[in-house]
Design a protein with these regions (language model features):
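Phosphate-binding P-loop/Walker A region and its immediate neighborhood
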Residues: 413-488, 503, 511-513
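Conserved P-loop NTPase motor module
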Residues: 621-744, 748-751, 759-775, 895-1000
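C-terminal regions of RecA-like/P-loop NTPase motor modules
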Residues: 3-23, 219-355, 423-453, 498-500, ...
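Glycine-rich phosphate-binding loop of nucleotide-binding enzymes
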Residues: 60-64, 69-77, 464-556
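Conserved P-loop NTPase motor cores
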Residues: 345, 477, 484-501, 506-511, ...
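Switch/coupling segment of Walker-type NTPase motor domains
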Residues: 55-56, 90-102, 108, 517-624
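Loop/turn-to-beta-strand initiation segments
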Residues: 84, 523-525, 739-742, 804-808, ...
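Extended, folded cores of ATP/NTP-driven motor/assembly subunits in large transport
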Residues: 1-426, 430-435
């Protein structure tokens, strides 16, 4: 009996201590968790926290009005009465930008290390450079459902809870569950569902946070430096700690130390002290008068302000941020409560009684009547409270920041803003998302529809959480991007930009990012088809970063139309006696392209003839009873002859297929693949197949022109003409990429279009390049059907690996293919089948009209780097809103100091996003990707002397513009009479740079 009495007194004392907010923990209203996404407050309120990423599309005046209408219309009914409220918290913190950039890059930085690529300097340069242009920001919407919502059921629910508590020991300082009201849960779920729907129809990107994520964000708001990204609170469902640390007023009956510690104790990890009516100090020891103005990393001074008088005009949230420099931290809370008119009832009564005595009260009464009219006309009046904090590591900077904050808030719609003059701790904690349902700010009432523009809903939303590329918005919001990720179902990208608009830089960034796949143990397949050397810098960067045994995986080759570069499109997979369906489709497209006259449409049945020839030619040269396999001839290939001699194999009388099988069974896979080049058909052999196969002659011997030329005649003539025109086509393969994974083929000498004949030549070389880089992209079980059993295990392993390996085809200067349908058809096939093969397809050209309707229709990413007068056509082609169209018209200005601006429209699993962003790359990246002759020469020489990473660091430091071109002009002019410099200026510059570096 006495023990129970003592316990009761202890509990009473503990409760009384909470009546006065002297303890920091008393400012936390959160008690515990109810389920995966719902927290419970100390009064039984239920709380859910949303991360608001922003608007999916660029928002201007027209789009803001639409969001205003949709969002407010959804919430009107529920806010007519008291009980539900939402809090918006927006945080901008410049001190967190570097850690945030690292967090976003981290999985891909680790992937580079896992792949043994030495690129730490490049990733670090991204962080350091972007930190100059970006700022950390986050936004949350907190849904509160208060017990007043269940006023009728509340008494019964409280009785049930009290009954459950009977006989339970006290648990001081721990989380409890006796305040959970069952009747409120359904109401809260309906409220959360309503909010989710309002966000969706308003095209706002969001995430409903799990309770552990929500509490982590609370703690980060209080102490970001002391909170790991992996930190998690202990909540019901977790194993409780077996602590023996005594609690205030604890007795031997108290079990609080054996349960989950209160959320407030888990969030408040540092001491907090009031230092002035508007300022608190978090962390650190008491500074002296002489040290309080000095920066201290373990101390944060926080000043609180609130809106004293409501704004005279509603102004968008963007206007507040536009007036605030990125280096000034901000945490602002906008609390909206339902039942605004109910809260005005007392004011209305008082105003009615005092109307005669005071003229001002007539104005109050008239204002209330106007608000009633608002509700009568379909809107809802809500109660709004707005307060904010800023901070610094010393009092001098804090004073400057809070003065700026006051001015900015006052100009946001013309309002009066005051520094907190009562409880600055409450001023701060009330801006922590979900921490408290109250605000120290003076509340005002307003129509809900008028408040929506003031909310931080319409910031540009990112799409990816993480990425090897970090783009940014114009005002510094971080925008990660990762090609080929699970955010999309297919990865078909169109990039268009006039020369000088930054296309090459963007493509190099994208292709670089594609190399890194978290968890991957091998380099993905990336094939780049280009006109010119713009991607050679990327290949050299990767080659320099790779260890010696991996350098062969990265290849840049300038393709030539000579026998030395022979590529036989009739090659098959090792041991395969026929092409797979994907390879067969490519061959059909290739032969149709040859058969079609320059500038003309394909003849009817061209594809059928090509298909028939392909079937018959492999059948004819097969090593079957009815086939005519090619006989082995000594001295055709020295490596094959040496391998046969090594194993004492007499190949006389053997056919090439037998040689292939024999070498394969001996484990000589590479030599077997070389031997197979002599077993497969050649292009010129298609002529005899078409002319002597009875079934083909019967079908395709009818005249197709006034000259009485048949389709077979045309086919034979076209083959002969193209064989003469392209020595690269009609010989056993000599150009072999081996095990290369990232390949750039430069078609500058062979792939330029213009006239119909040039377009056709370009198309053939593009198709040939597509074949050589993609021949291992599309492997599946169909390969086993065309291969003898001895190859099945080998191919099954390749198939399994190919299906899980990411692949990417990037075709630049796409306009050079003209209107050649065969290559367009191949590209569309690749795009449509991309998901099946884990394949990304990127097409880049100068104007959007270079892409036909089919490619535009199935594209899932559009990068628009220039538009100008074509902006209306681009708007229509890609369904852009009016604000985005105006950006395309006038704000895509090409490379500048802050990077390359572009409009990025992307189709994802959660909808279409269209954003205006910047590709801002560091001097280190610019030097890595540069392909001008001067830059390549100086980079190569410095790399030879000091290594790639050190060379990049020196060049980025000495020439931060990313090129030596301007410096070289000045240097040569200054030393125009110096014979040593004139004979080899690069050598002189490199020697000076090396000497300076070694002296450091």
């Amino acid at each position: 009996m006495f023990s129970k009495l003592v316990t009761g007194i202890d509990m009473l004392l503990y409760s009384l201590s909470n009546l006065t907010k002297k303890n920091l923990n008393d400012y936390c209203f959160i008690d515990t968790a109810s389920n995966r996404t719902t927290l419970v407050a100390k009064d039984g309120s239920l709380i859910s926290i949303f991360a608001i990423h922003g608007a999916k599309k660029i928002v201007g005046a027209e789009e803001l009005e639409a969001i205003q209408e949709k969002f407010s219309s959804e919430l009107l009914p529920i806010f007519k009465k008291q009980g539900h409220q939402i809090q918006f918290v927006f945080i901008r913190d410049p001190s967190r930008v570097k850690s945030e950039l690292k967090r976003r890059l981290d999985p891909y930085w680790k992937a580079a290390r896992n792949l043994k690529l030495d690129l730490d300097d490049l990733f670090q340069s991204k962080v350091d450079h972007l930190a100059k242009y970006c700022v950390y920001e986050s936004c949350y919407m907190v849904a509160w459902s208060r017990p007043i919502v269940i006023k009728a059921e509340l008494k019964d629910d409280q009785a049930k809870n009290n009954e459950l508590l009977t006989g339970l020991p006290p648990a001081i300082g721990a989380q409890s569950s006796y305040r959970l009201y069952e009747s409120l849960e359904n109401k809260h779920k309906a409220f959360v569902d309503l909010l989710e729907n309002a966000l969706r129809i308003s095209e706002i990107n969001f995430k409903l946070l799990e309770v552990k994520e929500g509490v982590r964000e609370m703690r980060k708001s209080f102490d970001n430096d002391g909170t790991s990204d992996n930190w998690e609170p202990l909540l019901p469902g977790d194993k409780p700690p077996m602590s023996v640390k005594p609690k205030p007023y604890a007795t031997e009956l108290d079990i609080g130390d054996k349960l989950w510690q209160s959320i407030s104790h888990q969030v408040f990890t540092k001491n907090c002290e009031i230092v002035s009516p508007d300022t608190i100090r978090i962390g650190g020891q008491n500074p002296t008068e002489s040290t309080k103005d000095l920066d201290s990393s373990d101390i944060k001074y926080v000043a609180s302000a609130y809106m004293e008088v409501p704004p005279q005009q509603t102004r968008p949230f963007k206007m507040l941020l536009d007036q605030l420099d990125n280096d000034i931290p901000l945490q602002i809370s906008i609390m909206i409560e339902g039942g605004g008119m109910e809260k005005m009832a007392l004011k209305a009564t008082a105003a009615a009684l005092l109307t005669i005595a005071n003229g001002n009260n007539k104005l109050i009464k008239e204002s209330i009547e106007k608000l009633r009219e608002v509700e009568m006309n379909g809107d809802t009046v809500v109660k709004v409270s707005i307060n904010a904090v800023t901070w610094a590591n010393n009092t001098k900077t804090l004073n400057l920041n809070k003065q700026t904050l006051i001015k900015v808030m006052q100009s946001w719609g013309t309002t009066d803003t005051m520094l907190c003059n009562s409880d600055p701790i409450e001023g701060f904690t009330s801006t922590i998302p979900g921490f408290s349902p109250t605000s120290p700010a003076n509340p005002f009432v307003a129509p809900l529809r008028d408040i929506v523009p003031m909310l931080p809903l319409t910031r540009q939303s990112h799409v990816w959480e993480e990425g090897a590329i970090i783009y940014r918005t114009e005002d510094g919001k971080i925008f990660p991007y990762q090609p080929g990720s699970g955010v999309q179902t297919t990865w078909n990208y169109l990039i268009f930009a006039l020369p000088g608009s930054g296309k090459s830089v963007l493509m190099n960034s994208d292709n670089f990012a594609s190399v890194f796949v978290p968890g991957a143990t091998e380099i993905p397949y990336i094939g780049i088809i280009d006109i010119g050397p713009s991607s050679s810098g990327l290949i050299q960067l990767l080659k320099d970063a790779a260890p010696e045994n991996m350098k062969h995986l990265f290849v840049y080759e300038r393709l030539k139309n000579t026998i030395d570069y022979s590529i036989n499109v009739f090659d098959t997979q090792l041991g395969a006696r026929a092409p797979t369906p994907a390879e067969r489709q490519f061959l059909v497209n290739f032969l149709v392209n040859i058969l079609t006259p320059a500038g003309k449409e394909p003849f009817d049945s061209s594809d059928n003839l090509a298909s028939a020839v392909i079937t018959e030619i492999y059948k004819y040269y097969a090593d079957t009873r009815s086939g005519n396999p090619k006989e082995y001839i000594k001295n055709r290939n020295a490596e094959v002859d040496e391998a046969l001699a090594k194993y004492n194999i007499n190949a006389k009388g053997m056919n090439w297929w037998k040689v292939v099988d024999t070498l394969f069974e001996l484990g000589e896979k590479r030599i077997a693949s070389i031997a197979q080049r002599y077993a497969v058909p050649l292009l010129e052999e298609c002529v005899s197949i078409a002319e002597r196969t009875a079934q083909i002659k019967d079908i395709y011997s009818k005249p197709i022109s006034d000259t009485q030329e048949t389709l077979i005649d045309r086919f034979s003539r076209a083959l002969s003409e193209n064989i003469a025109m392209f020595p690269v086509l009609n010989n056993p393969t000599q150009f072999d990429l081996g095990e290369a994974r990232v390949v750039s083929l430069d078609l500058d000498e062979v792939g330029k279009g213009g006239s119909p004949t040039d377009d056709k030549r370009a198309a053939i070389m593009y198709l040939l390049s597509r074949y050589i880089i993609g021949k291992n992209f599309k492997l599946d079980d169909s390969l086993l059907k065309v291969s003898p059993p001895i190859y099945h295990q080998y191919h099954q392993e390749r198939i399994d690996k190919a299906l899980r390996t990411k692949k990417r085809i990037c075709i630049d200067e796409y306009h050079n293919t003209g209107s050649i349908q065969s290559i367009r058809r191949q590209v569309v096939t690749d795009m449509r089948e991309g998901r099946k093969w884990n394949l990304q397809v990127v097409l880049a050209s100068q104007v959007y009209k270079d892409f036909d309707d089919a490619t535009r229709e199935i594209s899932t990413g559009r990068c628009i780097l220039s538009g100008g007068d074509s902006y209306r056509d681009i708007q229509k082609a890609f369904d852009l809103n009016e604000t985005t169209a105006q950006i395309v018209r006038s704000r895509l200005t090409g490379p500048g100091k802050g990077g390359v601006p572009f409009v990025f429209s992307v189709t994802t699993k959660t909808g279409i996003f269209s954003q205006y962003i910047f590709n801002t790359i560091s001097p280190t990246e610019m030097w890595a990707f540069s392909t001008t002759s001067e830059d390549v020469t100086i980079r190569r020489m410095l790399t030879a002397a000091l290594g790639a990473a050190t060379a990049r660091k020196i060049l980025a430091t000495e020439f931060p513009e990313g090129s030596i071109e301007n410096f070289m002009k000045r240097f040569l002019k200054e030393h125009e009479y110096d014979e040593v410099v004139k004979s080899n200026p690069y050598k002189v510059i490199v020697e000076r740079l090396v000497k300076r570096y070694k002296q450091l």
